[in-house]
Amino acid sequence: MSVVLSIKNVAKTYGAVRALNGVSFDVPQGSVFGILGPNGSGKTTLLGIVMDVLKANKGEFLWFGQPGGSPEQRKKIGCLLETPNFYSYLSGTDNLKITQAISGRGTKADIDEVLKKVNLYDRRWSSFKSFSLGMKQRLAIGAALLGNPKVLVLDEPTNGLDPVGIAEIRKLIVELKEQGHTIIMASHLLDEVEKVCTHAAILKTGNLITTGDVAEIMMDEDIVELSAADINALSSILQHFGKEVFFDEKKNTVQIIFPKGTAKMEEINQYCFNNGVVLTQLVLRKKRLEARFFELTNN
């Protein structure tokens, strides 16, 4: 899979504050790539650097294989780091005409196509002040789509929206991916990244915690909890089961972690019995995705 953005060892400080600390990852073409982390984790700073709004103290980034991205390559990138200043009394069409004239991106002929992409074509002549919060944000994304960029960079695209607006924007992001755009978006919402992103990088206090396919990063797991009269003997015979075996001293139990859907309870019970250990407890628990996220960010 081709890479549209490669970030290599990027660091940024503000005085004594280290906003980013040697962050590196690649964004695959055609993905919806989420940069996930709590407030203050460095998400917006990182987007500012790759969009040339901020300068890194260290490291580099490549757009389409070129350091920093040439002016020609930059035309392939649409960006929404903050909401544009639209005129409340003008229509969606007229607001985009002004944006197009100022930015020089695309042509006036592109505006109708952009409005169709963001599902505002039927309201194109309505005044901006009559739009819902979700519609206003869709128009802002439409402004970033002028010139038909290959990549769209969004900073917290659903921030401040009501539930209806959030659903509208998430649906739009998925639709834009299906139309061939690569989406890079910052978010502090685990639920958002789970629902719309194919890949993600998790940041905490400027450090990259993990990156990769969302399904792998946030993989749900089977946790089998066992106990026996002789807990030491149980721990000893279970070392060959699952990918990880832990002793929980507080509960006086042994936990085996399996990939989701692979724990076979009957086999575990039979194995223990065949090895001279009679179980007093055998319980299958599911690790919640939220727990996995907090586990990653708290380690």
Residue ranges: model-predicted function:
Residues 5, 12-185, 190-204, 210:
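ABC transporter nucleotide-binding domains
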Residues 170-255, 259:
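ABC transporter nucleotide-binding domain
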Residues 105, 243-247, 278-282:
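A short linear hydrophobic-aromatic micro-motif
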Residues 128, 251, 285:
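Residue-level "edge-of-site" marker
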Residues 73, 110, 213, 233-237, ...:
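Hydrophobic side chains in well-ordered alpha-helices
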Residues 260-299:
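C-terminal coupling/interaction segments
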Residues 1-11, 299:
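ABC-family P-loop ATPase nucleotide-binding domain
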